[in-house]
């Protein structure tokens, strides 16, 4: 089995070493590893670091340099040039790492059953705090219903797509942030068989300086967040759009601009774990309901 790992990077030469080392420790006879480093216009020493690693590792490590266009442009670049050749494809940000044995666990799973998408839990790291995030309820394994497949934890880390699913994904927007949420939501919508693994597949470094979560709240960020919410609603993932409104500054600007988001059905949190369901229902009823309105369709 061949696995393609896409590493999106921009001026992260000091951090990408850990990401690459985590792949070295994941090598297994069950998997042929192909690593594609897509440099989104860095001006640091990323190229030199990758060149040194290419001489040391036993797996395929390719480096591509492109003009800066943000995260969505990296995925588009890989798809347009058909760079990922693995049976399974995943995306790893340059400041994140895979947990040991993740690829071996994946290989054992997909050998026994036919899945379109395999979703691991992950560990959220912030300063010295580490918290395991359960992408789905711990006892859930196989998801087929559309609303059941939704998850508010929509970073690409630990999500492995079959190659044909990856290349079916819609083109992402470029030169804007937060396209990873749309990437994940589209993957979940198109996947017919989703397998959840109740095991952390990687470490996600939250609010690192320079990543999308550390971007200041200006008009550009507001517009990007608003567009993502509208796109998620179009994907029938309005519950995930609601999660974006947990950010206070986003709500403040929506209120100032008197913007409400149109949805075409009532909110349904039944696909989430009981604690996530209770929390989202409560904040929707008490805080967020005012930011949405039900758009009736004409007969």
UniProtKB/Swiss-Prot annotation:
Pfam families: Glycos_transf_2. GO terms for molecular function: glycosyltransferase activity. Signal peptide: none annotated. The keyword Acyltransferase does not apply. Gene3D superfamilies: Spore Coat Polysaccharide Biosynthesis Protein SpsA, Chain A. Its EC number is 2.4.-.-. CDD domains: Glyco_tranf_GTA_type. The keyword Chloroplast does not apply. SUPFAM superfamilies: Nucleotide-diphospho-sugar transferases (SSF53448). Keywords: Glycosyltransferase, Transferase. Belongs to the glycosyltransferase 2 family. This is Uncharacterized glycosyltransferase MG060 homolog. It comes from Mycoplasma pneumoniae (strain ATCC 29342 / M129 / Subtype 1).
